[in-house]
Regions:
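Thioredoxin-like thiol-disulfide oxidoreductase module
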Residues: 32-49, 75-76
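Structural micro-motif
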Residues: 46-56, 66
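Short loop or secondary-structure boundary microenvironments that flank
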Residues: 6, 31-32, 36, 59
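Non-catalytic, surface beta->alpha helical segment in thiol-disulfide oxidoreductase systems
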Residues: 57-77
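Residues that form or flank phosphate/diphosphate-binding pockets in enzymes
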Residues: 11-14, 37, 64
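Conserved beta-strand scaffold positions in the cores of enzyme catalytic domains, especially
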Residues: 27-29, 62
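Local sequence-structure signature of Cys/Sec-based thiol-disulfide redox active-site neighborhoods
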Residues: 1-25
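Short glycine-enriched loop/turn motifs at secondary-structure junctions
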Residues: 24, 56-57
């Protein structure tokens, strides 16, 4: 399962969701601005990262942003 960490009105978050649907990959979307705790958890999980989307596997492996997701999907086929 892939976790997408993003925000509302994030074009690349929507692109990531569409790309995962195209590859028929299951994902969970987490809006990091929903609560202050979720925002804090995002910065703790991805130290030094200030952009969304950020994608990770449920085992904790950090894929990266949208560009890294495309590369990861191409290599996982």
């Amino acid at each position: 399962m892939i976790e997408i960490y993003g925000t509302d009105n994030c074009v690349f978050c929507d692109k990531a969701k569409n790309l995962l649907r195209m590859y028929e990959k299951e994902y969970t979307y987490i809006d990091v601005t929903e609560t202050e705790d979720m925002t804090a958890a995002f910065f703790k999980k991805f130290p030094g990262v200030r952009t969304v989307p950020q994608l990770a596997l449920s085992d904790g492996h950090h894929i990266g942003g949208y560009t890294e997701l495309k590369k990861w999907l191409n290599h996982s086929e």
